[in-house]
């Protein structure tokens, strides 16, 4: 069986070793359930081994899950100076000689040894009608899984403030936008929600 079919069909050995790799400083072990049933491309795979039963035994992914970076909101971009919210507070950051081609809005941050090594925007988004039980629902009824660690930003008095997902589930806002790292069929999840 082909590795892509094995993952899509959930044929993963019980003792499979799966690692998602971003770079030499950023990588993590992945549980089989995180990728089982998703659609891989060969460009998502750095290395793999199948066992004699045709099950996936070893897999090194090429930054496939999207779980290796942090997600937040860029609130200001001026040259190599940035303001962003990852946790509860807005933080200023200067990248020195390195300039990232980004704009204000939803973003990912690659962080190694406590230092930001890359910033990029997340452009894939969906307008959400409701949020319930860790799922965002679009106007057409399509469901989008929301990451357990999704960041929620609600505009209060003209500024975005960090909230928790349960705050959206208690009160659905008239405008809610979910930003996802990639199509859900490929393991993508909503990582950031903005609301007002």
Regions found by a protein language model. Give the residues of each.
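...the same signal can extend to comparable exposed beta-sheet modules
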Residues: 1-196
């Amino acid at each position: 069986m082909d590795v892509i079919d094995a993952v899509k069909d959930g044929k993963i050995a019980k003792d499979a070793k799966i690692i998602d790799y971003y770079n030499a400083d950023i990588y993590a072990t992945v549980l089989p359930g995180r990728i089982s049933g998703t659609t891989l491309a060969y460009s998502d795979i750095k290395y793999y081994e199948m066992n004699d039963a045709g099950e996936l035994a070893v897999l090194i992914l090429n930054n496939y899950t999207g779980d290796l970076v942090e997600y937040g909101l860029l609130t200001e971009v001026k040259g190599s100076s940035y303001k962003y919210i990852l946790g509860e507070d807005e933080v200023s950051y200067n990248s020195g000689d390195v300039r990232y081609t980004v704009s204000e809005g939803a973003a990912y941050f690659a962080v190694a040894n406590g230092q930001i090594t890359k910033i990029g925007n997340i452009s894939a988004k969906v307008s959400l009608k409701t949020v319930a039980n860790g799922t965002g629902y679009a106007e057409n009824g399509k469901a989008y899984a929301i990451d357990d660690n999704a960041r929620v930003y609600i505009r209060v008095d003209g500024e975005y403030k960090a909230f928790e997902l349960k705050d959206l589930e208690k009160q659905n806002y008239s405008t809610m936008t979910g930003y996802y790292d990639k199509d859900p069929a490929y393991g993508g999840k909503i990582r950031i929600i903005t609301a007002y």
